[in-house]
A protein has these predicted regions:
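Internal helix-turn-beta structural module
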Residues: 44, 268-336
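N-terminal, positively charged regions that mediate nucleic acid binding
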Residues: 1-38
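A short glycine-rich, hydrophobically flanked beta-strand micro-motif that places a catalytic Asp/Glu
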Residues: 37-39, 159-167, 201-204, 270-281
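Short, charge-patterned binding micro-sites
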Residues: 38-57
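Short histidine-centered catalytic/ligand-binding loop motif
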Residues: 9-12, 127-134, 181-186, 241-252
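Conserved mixed alpha/beta catalytic, RNA-binding, or beta-rich assembly cores of soluble enzyme
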Residues: 21-22, 56, 121, 210-271
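Glycine-rich, mobile lid/loop segments that gate access to catalytic sites or pores
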Residues: 4, 45-47, 58, 69-213, ...
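Conserved phosphate/anionic-ligand binding catalytic regions in large, soluble enzymes, centered on
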Residues: 8, 12-17, 114-129, 211-235, ...
Length: 336
């Protein structure tokens, strides 16, 4: 049976957008751990649009500086712009359009009383194996991270990287890599060394050339790489994007909680699925279910876990400036 998973680097414009939003949230939380934050980002060429709602006592400061600092952390800095020229974003030319307002009073009246910021259904997953995620996703991420770190040190390779792994049963059938190159570079042996085995097929830059990249080649928008952020095809995706929100938002905190519960309840099962739901303005969870699979036998157990947002926020340190790091790591990169 063939199984395929994809991974993308934070140099990909969609993930760059996620990272910028998460970075700005970190700067706000440093001043105001109780801030309410929901900011979407669009990045195209050298223009960044920020739109959403923020309620905080923090001073936002110069948003353009925050955006440039986030880009620099990713690797889009002055050195990178000098090497790549017209082929990549230039942080010195960044223009920021600010369309940020304040949170709706209708939402605030529930959230301020320790209620969830939205309704929704949330899914957590864990399985046996490295990272407690499906092997094809683990390998796609491992290869992506290795290529990204290599590119950060290179004068020839770019950081907008996509990797895709197809397993046939448990053997690596195909490894696909898209990575910007100023001149051709054979990465075959590097791919094999990272994966620990030789795939039947290795495809690097399938179009033959890949130079224009990042927001110069592709418009990036927050929340568009959820299959990569979550569990690929191993299970349904719950809620919406977690990356543009503070911890009062169920899309973030209950997806984190569902993943942790799945890891905790995996035990000696082959797979564990956790399903949670929320109601806006209420602090109890309307429903919860744990499904486990072991040797083909499926078991179900109701889960009663009326966890308030404040309880989970404190337990997982979600009132700390950890969001950019979490965005890079992904929800399914969490194990405890």
């Amino acid at each position: 049976m063939q199984r395929t998973a994809e991974a993308v680097s934070i140099g990909h414009p969609d993930k760059t957008a996620d990272y910028i939003s998460s970075y700005i949230l970190d700067r706000i939380i440093e001043q105001d751990p109780n801030a309410r934050y929901a900011v979407e980002v669009m990045i195209k060429d050298n223009t960044v649009v920020l739109g959403g709602e923020v309620t905080t006592s923090a001073l936002l400061g110069d948003l353009a500086t925050h955006v440039k600092n986030a880009l620099s952390e990713i690797g889009y800095d002055e050195r990178y712009a000098t090497i790549w020229g017209k082929f990549a974003i230039d942080p010195a030319q960044i223009k920021v359009i600010n369309m940020i307002g304040v949170q709706s009073a209708d939402i605030a009246q529930g959230v301020d009383h320790d209620g969830w910021g939205d309704q929704g259904v949330f899914v957590g997953y864990a399985c046996q194996g490295e990272g407690k995620i499906n092997r094809e996703l683990f390998l796609a991420r491992k290869l992506n991270k290795a290529l990204y770190e290599k590119a950060r040190q290179s004068d020839n390779l770019g950081i907008d990287i996509k990797t895709q792994i197809t397993l046939n049963d448990d053997k690596i059938e195909t490894a696909i890599v898209a990575i910007p190159m100023l001149s051709d570079e054979d990465l075959t042996e590097f791919v094999i060394s990272v994966l620990g085995e030789k795939p039947a097929h290795i495809i690097i830059n399938g179009t033959g050339r890949y130079t224009y990249h990042g927001s110069i080649a592709d418009c990036g928008i927050t929340g568009r790489k959820l299959a990569c952020d979550f569990y690929s095809t191993a299970c349904p995706i719950g809620g919406g994007s977690p990356w543009t929100k503070d911890a009062s938002k169920a899309d973030l905190t209950l997806n984190v909680y569902a993943r942790i519960l799945a890891c905790e309840n995996l035990a000696d099962n082959d797979e564990c699925f956790v399903y949670l739901s929320s109601c806006i303005g209420r602090n109890e969870l309307p429903s919860g279910l744990i499904k486990t699979i072991k040797n083909g036998i499926v078991s179900y157990r109701d889960l009663w876990c009326n966890q308030k947002p404040s309880t989970l926020i404190k337990a997982y340190g979600l009132d700390k400036p950890i969001y950019a790091k979490l965005c890079d790591k992904s929800i399914s990169g969490i194990q405890n």
